[in-house]
């Protein structure tokens, strides 16, 4: 976008303004704040700006008030110091003045958005001279307002926010300062196996946490009591362990854990060595010795990639492991990139978000990029850029 003349052009910008809401009020405006520089740049260049976004998961093709972007339009108006009208039937066409921005109502209210309907994508493309894809968080979805319109617009380009996200991730994965340490938490090996396998070729150390660690511990012959575990993935975990050893990747498992008989606010939490977990106990966090080991690895790291908490941080008694890890990452001189909804919620809880080098709000796209997948919207933008260069 920064290479184009936007003056007097109809510029359609796809942002990710999918902010959390409670009772019609925005509870976290991080995604809106991140989108502002791109929108401001277009307004300053006297473009005729149309902003697109989705919000939540409404029934496609149907207006549902709770998923309306009205609260977002109000906040944008405040942040941009100009009235940003919310336009409902924008597909019929809308007149925008140079230097003005409008917000188009939730793209998911349009039938055909999710399955990337060609007619819908072409209609969106007709409404603009330039399409700017700035929403990395939706780049992994081939939908009408992302990859679809990018294919048919007269001119399609990447926005500054999308570029910054791709550059941050590429810096961590393609040309990292060594040693590269990855932390992969979460409850299931099955949802993170592609990520783990892709990271294995890149990292020096790989820390697994949460339910994923339980599956690895059980595969190594430890008793994990009633802990969350995927028994059908024990063989895969064992094979992965062997592969890591072959590639000289260190996979430090917990040496001590925090256990309880049940998961509740008033559960009696006890620190146990990993070989002392009884059959009626469940593991809900890592213990202090494990945290100390992880902190040492963070201090020595050149680059840190973190996705997923390593304990049930929402409950105070089981939050120490994730808290200690977040503090160690914050303290480290390493370049740190952190993503995933639960991880961001943990950082928020511990007031450490701004101590990370780069925080990705992208969720699924962050994960798929780390898995080594080519994201549909980025693929089409790359193709369009090549076409443009050849002209």
Swiss-Prot record:
Q: Name one Pfam family in it.
A: PGK
Could you list this entry's UniProt keywords, alphabetically sorted. Answer: ATP-binding, Cytoplasm, Glycolysis, Kinase, Nucleotide-binding, Transferase
Which annotated residues bind ATP?
A: 192, 314, 340-343
Binding of substrate: at which residues?
A: 16-18, 31, 54-57, 108, 141
Q: Which domain of life is it from?
A: Bacteria
Class of enzymatic activity (EC top level): transferase
Q: What is its main location?
A: cytoplasm
Compartments where found: Cytoplasm
GO cellular component terms attached to this protein's record: cytosol
* Protein EC: 2.7.2.3
SUPFAM superfamilies for this protein: Phosphoglycerate kinase
Name the pathway: Carbohydrate degradation; glycolysis; pyruvate from D-glyceraldehyde 3-phosphate: step 2/5
Q: Name one GO biological process term.
A: glycolytic process
Under the GO molecular function aspect, what terms does this record hold?
ADP binding; ATP binding; phosphoglycerate kinase activity
Q: What is the catalytic activity of this protein?
A: (2R)-3-phosphoglycerate + ATP = (2R)-3-phospho-glyceroyl phosphate + ADP
* Record text on subunit structure and interactions: Monomer.
Family the entry assigns: Belongs to the phosphoglycerate kinase family.
Q: What is this protein called?
A: Phosphoglycerate kinase
């Amino acid at each position: 976008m920064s290479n184009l003349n936007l003056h007097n052009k109809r510029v359609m910008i796809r942002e990710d303004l999918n902010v959390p809401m409670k009772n019609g009020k925005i509870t976290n405006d991080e995604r809106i704040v991140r989108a502002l520089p791109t929108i401001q740049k277009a307004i300053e260049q006297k473009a005729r700006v149309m902003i697109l976004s989705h919000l939540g998961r409404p029934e496609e093709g149907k207006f549902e008030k709770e998923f309306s972007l009205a609260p977002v339009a109000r906040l944008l108006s405040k942040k941009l110091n100009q009235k940003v009208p919310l336009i409902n039937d924008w597909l019929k066409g809308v007149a925008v003045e140079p230097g003005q921005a409008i917000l188009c109502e939730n793209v998911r209210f349009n039938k055909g958005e999710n399955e990337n309907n060609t007619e819908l994508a072409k209609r969106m493309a007709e409404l603009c001279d330039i399409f700017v894809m700035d929403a990395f968080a939706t780049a992994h979805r081939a939908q009408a307002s992302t990859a679809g319109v990018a294919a048919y617009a007269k001119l399609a380009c990447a926005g500054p926010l999308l570029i910054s996200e791709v550059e941050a991730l590429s810096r961590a994965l393609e040309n990292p300062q060594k040693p590269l340490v990855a932390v992969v938490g979460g409850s299931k090996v099955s949802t993170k196996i592609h990520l783990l396998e892709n990271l294995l070729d890149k990292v020096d150390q790989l820390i697994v946490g949460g339910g994923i660690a339980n599956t690895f511990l059980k595969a190594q012959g430890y008793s994990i009591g009633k802990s969350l575990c995927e028994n059908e993935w024990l063989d895969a975990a064992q094979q992965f362990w062997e592969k890591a050893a072959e590639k000289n990747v260190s996979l430090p498992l917990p040496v001590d854990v925090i256990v309880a008989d049940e998961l509740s606010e008033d559960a009696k939490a006890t620190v146990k060595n990993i070989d002392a977990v009884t059959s009626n106990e469940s593991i809900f966090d890592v213990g202090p010795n494990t945290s100390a080991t992880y902190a040492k690895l963070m201090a020595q790291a050149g680059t840190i990639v973190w996705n997923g908490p390593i304990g049930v941080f929402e409950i105070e008694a089981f939050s120490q492991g994730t808290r200690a890890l977040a503090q160690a990452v914050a303290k480290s001189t390493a370049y740190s990139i952190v993503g995933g909804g639960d991880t961001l919620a943990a950082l928020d809880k511990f007031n450490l978000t701004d101590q990370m080098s780069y925080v990705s709000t992208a969720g699924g796209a962050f994960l798929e990029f780390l898995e080594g997948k080519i994201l549909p919207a980025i693929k089409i933008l790359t193709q369009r850029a090549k076409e443009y260069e050849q002209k």
